[in-house]
């Protein structure tokens, strides 16, 4: 793991580490809420990134060439995978599109939460280009993959109530078995 001082700015370091906080936050939300919709959302986000990785292996477009060492936004570490589409952008597109209509979650400030979601998403998408990990096109295509995945995944959820029933039954069964082992 890189230190903040390895980056051109602390902001870029924070944005480069969003995958850790987003993954941890999603896992905590699943464990905390124990709700089928939360698990469905996480499975869709994971599925969208798997789709991006498959597309990436099919297209095989390289990442942008490394910047010169004198460039302020020189990448911290070279990425060894292909760049099209950006998997981070796919996940961000999915999260943004799926979460937007669900906000507010816990407060009455719908526009405050939506503004925070938009700013964090926008800054993180920008950072993928600024750090030299992706081209603008790779980020845009990744975002489009995520947006379309979220729309399809949400449509599946809305059109089939059996999904919620089956997932909630699974969650409750697993929880009960885990709790009974420690009781």
Q: For each predicted feature, which ranges?
A:
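N-terminal transmembrane-helix/juxtamembrane module of multi-pass inner/ER membrane proteins
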Residues: 1-30, 36-44, 49-82, 173-183
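Membrane-embedded catalytic cores of phosphoryl/pyrophosphoryl-handling enzymes
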Residues: 68-183
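Structural signal for the C-terminal ends of transmembrane alpha-helices
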Residues: 29-34, 100-104
